[in-house]
Amino acid sequence: MLSRVCPTLRYNRIWSAHAREMPRATLLLLQPNFFHSSPKTALVNRLDVTSSEFSSMFRRSFHALRSTVGDWRKLPKPPGQVFAERREYRKIRRRAPKKKQELELSVSICIEEQLPDDLEIQNIAEMLRLNVPMAMTLAFNGLKDSKYKTRETDIEDLGGYETVELSVMLCNDDFICKLNKEWRGEDHATDVLSMSQHVPELKLPVLMMGDLVISVETAARQAAERGHTLLDEIRILVIHGLLHLLGFDHEISDEAEQEMEEEEELLLKNLGWKGKGLIQSAYDIQKTTTVQPEKSDDRKEGDGLRLYKPKFSYIFCDMDGTLLNSKSQISEANAKALKEALLRGLKVVIATGKSRPGAIRILKTADLTGSDGIISESSPGVFVQGLLVYGRQGKEVYRGNLDRDVCRETCLYSLEHRIPLIAFSQDRCLTLFDHPLVDSLHTIYNEPKAEIISSVDQLIAEADIQKVIFMDTTEGVSSVIRPYWSEATGDRANVVQAQSDMLEIVPPGTSKGNGVKMLLNHLGVSPDEIMAIGDGENDIEMLQLASLGVALSNGAEKTKAVADVIGVSNDQDGVADAIYRYAF
């Protein structure tokens, strides 16, 4: 399992007939000149390539480079210094100091054609396109002042290179088994092969490191054994293979194994990637079981790729008090976790008391909107406490309206006591008078700016109302408004409190849980496939419905009482913590 192809095997990579190539990742878009030249030196003006063919699965070739030398033509000197001499001094133009060219890291990610067009594999390949250059940078930095005694030092000083090239291929067990047998004489699948292309004798400005070949099938089995995701395992294999290309080899001695293990653990820690290094993980497995190499001939014909899938298909997430912090902002950590969930194939659905425009407005700041985000006007979602449910292509699945008599009574109460009220009507917010708290619903909570309607009758006739919100102090809501309306509405409406300074009046039977249930029926998804995250009393039914309900620690006591687990608070990136802890 912990093996590699000997670094002295040199070959010309020909992936095109066997693989799909992802877009190349380039940290710095610098176009290197293949050869440097100056008037004081001979010019390399031609590059000839000769090849020596040998039998190979890839039809690889050894290459030798030879160059021919051309002479610089001497040009006549320009008629300079004429005016300078008349002024009896020479005018010298100082050359600007030559800027040090930064190293360009060029990474190709390939998917072997026999792998299925699986979304998870494609997402992992896209993650590697970003991750591998980061790992290379840290690994190169680790070579500086390195005290390792067993590492081959063919790759030492990177200052003489302009570009570093590396290719990573994801394949199945059959592919890597054939490669392993051909190059190493071992007829079994392995997890990663490191195939160097670096020739120290050739003084080129391009460091061609070679290829990392990773079996997704073997990686998936190891991920399941070790209790982490397929992406985590492939990242570990990338680190292991990269260190082999940099001259580490755990097979030559105990000291070499210890040095490579230390470097693996250090890189994984500095990158913030999960899991132990491959060497340490192998020893952990050996303590509990002895794993025999699996020969390709022993596998049943037709066995498909067995991936380590995420634990859930969907994540339903509340916004206020959950995804958003106490300043009604989404943190960078929460946004990053949601994006990674999407890359891993999970679908994220917003279930909130907010209107759809309000949710879109705030999530747009974190680049989470649109067709590749978690919310748009053409994506599923549960809004206004489950009273507006949108399904595929954003089409309305359900709309619930508040009783008109209840609407009228709440409006009259608002005018009489001068307590601000906001009525939600699909994508609009309506109110009867201007008030700072009404403005805060737009400026702080990002809801649509409330339209002031001149009379109660006009507001009732304006449109169907899904819910109304009273806004007051926390004490005013808890001691006056809530007790009054809990009794006044009877069975005509429900009283819901998502925020301590707001009270919502909604149609009877309204809950996010019902909205989520209707959306699941529309999508054909079982509640067993979902994880839900919330904090308020309006999230209770949703958390109870989900296979795993996570209440954040800042949530209501009633909500935490019904949750399966209690996470950290919304000001501590509770959503990100829950996703990394329970969803992956």
From Swiss-Prot:
InterPro entries linked to this entry: Cof, HAD-like_sf, HAD-SF_hydro_IIB, HAD_sf, MetalPrtase_cat_dom_sf_prd, YbeY, YbeY_CS
Disruption phenotype: Seedling lethality.
Keyword match Flavoprotein: no
EC number: 3.1.-.-
Residues annotated as transit peptide in the record: 1-50
Coiled coil: none
Its biological purpose: Endoribonuclease required for chloroplast ribosomal RNA (rRNA) processing and essential for normal growth and development. May be involved in maturation of both the 5' and 3' ends of 16S, 23S, and 4.5S rRNAs. Cleaves chloroplast rRNAs, mRNAs and tRNAs in vitro.
Family recorded in the similarity comment: Belongs to the endoribonuclease YbeY family.
Protein name, UniProt field: Endoribonuclease YBEY, chloroplastic
Organism annotation: Arabidopsis thaliana
